[in-house]
Swiss-Prot record:
UniProt similarity note: Belongs to the SPT3 family.
Keyword Amino-acid biosynthesis listed: no
Gene3D superfamilies in the record: Histone, subunit A (1.10.20.10)
Function: Component of the transcription regulatory complex SAGA, a multiprotein complex that activates transcription by remodeling chromatin and mediating histone acetylation and deubiquitination. The SAGA complex predominantly acetylates histone H3. Required for oogenesis; involved in transcriptional activation.
Protein biosynthesis recorded as keyword: no
Protein's UniProt name: SAGA complex subunit Spt3
Annotated GO biological process: transcription by RNA polymerase II
Assigned keywords, A-Z: Chromosome, Nucleus, Transcription, Transcription regulation
Principal subcellular localisation of the protein: nucleus
GO molecular function, one term: protein heterodimerization activity
Quaternary assembly: Component of the Spt-Ada-Gcn5 acetyltransferase (SAGA) complex consisting of wda/Taf5L, Saf6, Taf9, Taf10b, Taf12, Ada1, Spt3, Spt7, Spt20, Sf3b3, Sf3b5, Nipped-A/Tra1, a histone acetyltransferase (HAT) module made up of Gcn5, Ada2b (Isoform B), Ada3 and Sgf29, and a deubiquitinase (DUB) module made up of not/nonstop, Sgf11 and e(y)2 tethered to SAGA by Atxn7. Taf5 and Taf10, which has partially redundant properties with Taf10b, may also be part of this complex.
Disruption phenotype: RNAi-mediated knockdown in female germ line cells results in arrested oogenesis at stage 6-7.
Gene Ontology annotations for the cellular component aspect, listed alphabetically: histone acetyltransferase complex; nucleus; SAGA complex
Amino acid sequence: MNYNAKRVMRQNSVCVGSNDMAASPIMIGPAPPSAPSTPQLQTTEDIKPLLVQRQVILLQSGSIPTNPSPQQINLAGHNVAGGASGSNVANVLIPDDAPVSLLTEIADIMRSFGDSDQPRTGSVKLVEQILQQQLRGIFNEASLVAMRRKQNPCPSQADFEFLMRNHPVKIARMRKHLKDMRILKRFLSIRTGRPQDFMDDLEQQEEDEELAIDVYELHDEDRMRRLFRADRISQILTGQQYLEFNEARKTSFYCRHGEKIKNKFRRFLDLPADLRIPTPTMNILAYLAHETIAAIVDYSILTRLNSDNRATEPYSRVTSAGGSPAMMHVCPEVTQGRGMEVVKPISVPEIHEAMRRFRQMSSRKIGRYRNSCDIDFRRSFLAI
């Protein structure tokens, strides 16, 4: 090897001493943000909420351990607490802004609408991604409608009802739900002795005056089908299973755990921090989240009924109620494997197929095909 080759090798090499290594801290921090990409499914370890913290360790020697042991981290913390001025060991905790996950609540809501008592992790995560996209799209559309008003650009109940103007049954269902929630809130405030928030009542009265669509109480087929399905499911459960099923039916994004779940739901939507959203609007978004999950479960069960994998024994679909065979034409998805067999959880391909059919039916007109290039094209949402 000649002299020029050795010189190039010496220039490309870097020699770091132990003293320089001890004097210069090595920051173990988050990686630089990369370009946005398509959302990827997480692993099964992301179901449990974890508090992720990063450690910043100043090394004393030239040897750099790739995975420091907990004893070394604790030792570093004790040295910093001792207040030694010449110490080169420090321990700094940096909280990680991990994305908020609602896997537990979504799994309970899916179970309450007819899924298995142990939903698949991949299915729940896929529903979570669809839910976030749907809710952010609905809020964006409602904001565009609200921006036409100069005095109050914040979305209100009238804006969401304007988006649902072609579905009066859904408008009546949402109004009935919000009315029941106001009655329940007043009852709980009287029972617990807590003072009521009169500002919310004033905002609600202003919204009631803005509602220009007169919707009468109509026959809600979807709601009756869900109630019938829940009734048939409850008839074949044991005592402990019924208690768990009842708790799952109580799950929501605004009642359970109070302000904690409300703040978690707002962080899940990833809305701007400086955006002021009134409480009635957040209640409507929470209701639409509940309806979106219900629609996904409904379409997934109907997709399973229309697919070829519906291979079950006819007598195993008969429940303990004597009228089940006679009611199969009313709600056939109640008997999708229940009875002698174990209920099969909703799979990811069934959800994809259900969403494909929904988008195909919602993006077509009678007589001609409509694509995204049309002027009157609007994004399809499950809840509205």
